[in-house]
Amino acid sequence: MQYSNDLFDLRIEIGNKIKKQMEQKKISKAKLCRETGMSRPTLDKMLSGNITNKTNYDKHISKIMNCLGISSDVLLGNIKKNRTRNIREILRKSIEDIANFTGISVDRLKDIEYGAEATLTELRDIAMCFSTSVNVIQGKNFFEPQLAKMDLLIPNIGEDKNDDVNGFWGYIGILTSHGKKYKWFPITRITRKFVYQDMENKYIVIPCMNNKVLFLSMDNIDRIVLLDEACDYPVDLDWPMDTGDEKISEEEVPQVLYELLEYYYLGESVEMSDNLHKCLEEFVDEYKISDDEIEDIINGIEIHYADGLDESDTIEFYENENISDAVSYVYDHDDYDDYDCMDEVLYYTGYNERESIIKLKNVAMLELPFIKLENAIIEKNDL
C-alpha cells in the first residue's frame, strides 16, 4: 500500500484523523466495525494508535479507508505530529479542561489534535497543562516521556498501565567509587524499571526529573539505592534535606519550564503566553534560583571521577563534543555487550570555550542537562 510506512509511523495522528472523518460522515464505531468486520477492541487500538504490528495495521487501515471512502492522501494531508489527544485521554482530561487551562479554544484544540500545525506558544501552553515538554507533545522526545506528577495519580495504574507516559516514582541514590557521599535524584517509574533491567551493563543512562541525565560507568559505581517516595528518608545515606546542601525535590516542575529558563536568563523575547510567563516567574521565585544556578541548570555538567575527584563545568552541545553520542548509543542500544563503537575518550567544549578531553575509563558518573542533551540528540539523529 502506498505511504503505508508513513501511516504506520504516524498512527496516533492518523487515528485522530479517522475519528474526525467518522464525525464528519456521522459513522459510529459500531457501524464501522460491522462494515469492516473488525472487532471493537481492534478498532479502539487503531483509533488510539496502539497497534504495534505493522502487518496487522496495514490490513486494518485499508479496511477503514475503504469503508470511509478516503485515500491515504486525505489522512496524511497537512498533518503535524503531536500527542495532545493521546496524552489527554491517558490523563482522562476533557478538551474543555485543556481549553480552560490554556485559553486555547475548544475548536482550535480539536484542530491541533487532528493534526493541524500548532504555534510554539500553543505547544508550550499544552505542555504546561500536561506537566511535560514540547518534545513530548510533538512526539520527538528521545528519553521516555515524563509528566511532573505523582505516578500514582496518573490514571490506569496497575500491572497493565500505559508506559507511554509516567510520573514521579521516588529517588535514586548513587555512591561512586571513592565518592564521599551519595548523590540523590528524582526519577520516574519507568526509570526505576530500566535501572533493574540494565544493572548488569557496563554503562547506564538514567534520565531524572530535575533536568538531569546521568551517565554511569558501572565499574566505578559502588552502590545504587532506589527509594520509593513513600519510604522514610535515609538519614544515614547523606539525604540532602538533612544536610541542607542540595535541592532534589523538583519532580513537580514541568520540563517546559526548563526549556524556557535560558530565555528568561538572557532576557530574550520568546513565543510564550502571559500565563506561562507567570508560571515561569513563579518557578524561579519559589525555588529562589539565582542567575548562576540558572546557568548551571541549563548548561551545567558535573564530572565525578573514579578516584573521587569532582569537577563542575558547562557544556556546549552544538560545539565539538561526543558526549551526546555516547549517551544516545548506550540509552538506545540493544546489544549491551557491544561497546566497540564507543570512543575511549570523551571530549566537549566547556566554559570560556575550553576544550576538554577525558578518558572514559576514569569516569564514574556524569551529570548532564536533560533538555540541552535531548535537543542535541534529536538534531543529530534527525528525530
Please describe what each predicted stretch is.
Residues M1-S28, S71-L91:
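A short, Lys/Arg-rich alpha-helix, primarily the initiator
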Residues Q2-D9, V74-K80, N86, V134-K181, ...:
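Intrinsic disorder/low-complexity detector
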Residues K29, I61, T84, I95, ...:
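Helix-turn-helix DNA-binding elements, focusing on the entry/boundary residues of the two helices
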Residues A30, P41, D73, E96, ...:
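Key DNA-contact positions within bacterial/archaeal DNA-binding proteins
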Residues K31-R34, S94-N100:
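Short alpha-helical "recognition helix" segments of helix-turn-helix
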Residues G37-T55, G103-A118:
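Recognition helix of helix-turn-helix/homeodomain-like DNA-binding domains
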Residues Y57-V74, T121-V136:
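DNA major-groove recognition helix of helix-turn-helix/homeodomain DNA-binding modules
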